[in-house]
Amino acid sequence: MNTRMILSLLMMIGGLALLLLITTSWAPARGVNNSTVGTVDWGRYTGSWYEIARKPHSFEKGMSHVKATYTARPDGTIEVRNEGIKNGKHKVARGKARTTNTPGQLKVTFFIFPGEYNIMELGPDYSYSVVGGSNGSYLWILARTPELNPATLNGIYSRLEERGYDLSDLLLVEQ
């Protein structure tokens, strides 16, 4: 085999591996119901939310005291400010969200990376929110206060398990 054939073969294998990685990480998780709530009053939803628990992922690894603040903008979008403490330093990420045709769903963009923000459960008084991504690997439990009533939190856990979520790796966030 000559060098050109070997390089072509390596590029083809690399391309197939990349395609496999993309399709498996972005595909909906089997058996997970991430359907959204029927309606959201976005005026009530804006404001500050404390992160109570989350599935682990790279962009929040090692973060504590995490809080998200949503602010309505005149153009109809929502400004997103996520902040927390990592290695003793205050970190802030800013993004923009817009509603979609699906009730209870936002498309949130940080830098150039868009993602689905599916509000799967919302407290009747907007005191807590359960948010998932496009697959079962993203999950957040948010509350208006740094702590959530244990009975409420246990009820959320039960309903998430009924939706097919594996909570064995769920992280409680230090506030």
Show the residue positions of the predicted features.
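A beta-rich soluble binding module of mature secreted/lumenal proteins
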Residues: 2-175
